[in-house]
């Protein structure tokens, strides 16, 4: 048994649960990936030597064909059925499925995205994918944002998913909808943030503001008094802190 700090031990357990690898191999891959569980898992599954059994690519295509649109090489119309079959029943995990499949469009998984992801995850049946997504659920549901690289990557992905075609920013309404899904259980003052935006901003949100808002949430969850207005924060977040101090004391 290896002696590890609590956070690394948790990641090691998660890695072993997903891959069924030994503890020694889990530690090796996690160290190589700077203890980022998702990256370590991807690297593990990218190495054919880790698998004694032949991977059934035809089985993946059979699964894809079950859910694909009529006349289209994508899953869209039957996406709700697909996520239900892998035991996904909430909006955050529906977005998490798109994240794991590295989709480029909201509500659509192309054939290439599906085939490449299922092979990368070494899933050639629905039950193994369901197991993978349950581990993702555990990662994303943690309220410890300071030690959750998986949630940060998921959060940043969601912004790109929300962009309209040929747009760099995301509309305020779309951002509010997405923030509600991904942060409603992680930031107690989320509704105050929305009230501020609707009263004083009303404009699209930039990627920089979206990303840095997560860093702000980490501070505000501890104490908003620890916010340093002299730091390299977007003006919008500076203005929100002033709004909060004036209206929420």
Curated annotation (Swiss-Prot):
Q: Which residues form a coiled coil?
A: none
Write the record's keywords in alphabetical order, separated by commas: Ubl conjugation pathway
- Molecular function terms in GO for this entry? cullin family protein binding; ubiquitin conjugating enzyme binding; ubiquitin-like protein binding
Q: Name one GO cellular component term.
A: ubiquitin ligase complex
Fetch the InterPro entries from UniProt.
DCN-prot, DCN1-like_PONY, PONY_dom, UBA-like_sf
SUPFAM superfamilies in the record, alphabetically? UBA-like
Determine if Cytoplasm is one of this entry's keywords: no
In this protein, which residues make up the domain named UBA-like? 4-49
Which ranges carry the DCUN1 domain? 55-245
- Report disulfide bridges, numbered on this chain: none
Known function: May contribute to neddylation of cullin components of SCF-type E3 ubiquitin ligase complexes. Neddylation of cullins play an essential role in the regulation of SCF-type complexes activity.
Q: What is this protein called?
A: DCN1-like protein 1
Q: To which species is this protein native?
A: Dictyostelium discoideum
